[in-house]
Amino acid sequence: IGNMELSRRHHMIFEGPPGTGKTTVARIVAHLFYALGILENTTVIETKRNELEGKWVGDLSGKINEKVDSALGGVLFIDEAHQLYNKEDPYDKGKQVIQAFVPRLENDGEKFIAIIAGYTKEMEEFLKFDPGLASRFQHKIIFESYKPQVVAQIVVNILKKNKIEFNEKYVK
């Protein structure tokens, strides 16, 4: 986060094993980018595949558009995003979610931050499915097997180093 250039889009990929603080850091990102004046609010809409699918094959947008609309001004965090793509199933509804998500990243990309998270190997495979999806994410953060408290302390150190004011209660 400390080396990110200010740009108009700040979508991120978080990769790493479970329990490394990806969700915690997504919440911190919301507060950080709000403090920087990039986001309008600190809202974090957390979701997973089962909350994004349409009810039937052909329901292209599923609930992804509702989730993006809810996240406007804040952060949309899709945990275990790699589960959206099942290359073994040609009728998998997750593909339709991705196809509806890519235009929202492009058209509304300056109005929210999308963070997709998952396990490293699975995320790399997932991102190969749609090069358009991968190209919409400007930042990739690799999470090692740190405890959330350590990750929070790393973020605090970065914030302090960059002299960014923040409320410490949000990084605990």
PLM regions and their residue ranges:
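Short conserved motifs of the RecA-like P-loop NTPase core
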Residues: 84, 152-154, 166-172
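Walker A/P-loop
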Residues: 3-42, 66-69, 137
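Conserved nucleotide-binding/hydrolysis micro-motifs of P-loop NTPases
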Residues: 20, 51-53, 82-84, 119-124, ...
